[in-house]
Amino acid sequence: DGAFALEVMEYINKKVDEYKEKDGYLYAIYGTPAENLCGLQVKQFRKKFGIVANVSDKPYISNSFHCHVSEDISPIQKQDLEKRFWDLFNGGKIQYVKYPIDYNTAAVETLINRAMDMGFYEGVNLSLSYCDDCGHQELNMDVCPKCGSRNLTKIDRMNGYLSYSRVKGDTRLNQAKMEEIKDRVSM
């Protein structure tokens, strides 16, 4: 439900305010992307705390204050759930929402306008996979259902930018990030 994460962020903000008052420096909290850190961080956590359900039981850790990528929730639910964290990251943040590529443009526009009304800087995630052998396109595929090829190019959002998660079947991304991409439902 995010209650503990909210409690932690409120505590961190309180400490930041205390330090600002104490030394006069301007500190900020950034809702950070960590594409390469997601695998390393879970290993470090497990070394100290072991495997904890819903925290370190996957080969990656999700970024920042976002709902877990595997949550089966609508874009509106995701906006509503993440809103409570928004003002706690005063140094920068982005909210990611996954829209199926076949969404109608009026629906996408409505959701973006809703996000803007809520004060979000929202990244719209539109994934695409295509077969380099026959040209077939789908939202997400590991093997082309038309010709059986694994020679695919896949485009996914990578923490603020669109990136090739596969080019001609190969990837430059670490295994933890590829596992996170595979689990994506709401992000």
Residue ranges and their predicted role:
Residues D1-M187:
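Long, C-terminal-biased catalytic regions of enzyme "large/alpha" subunits
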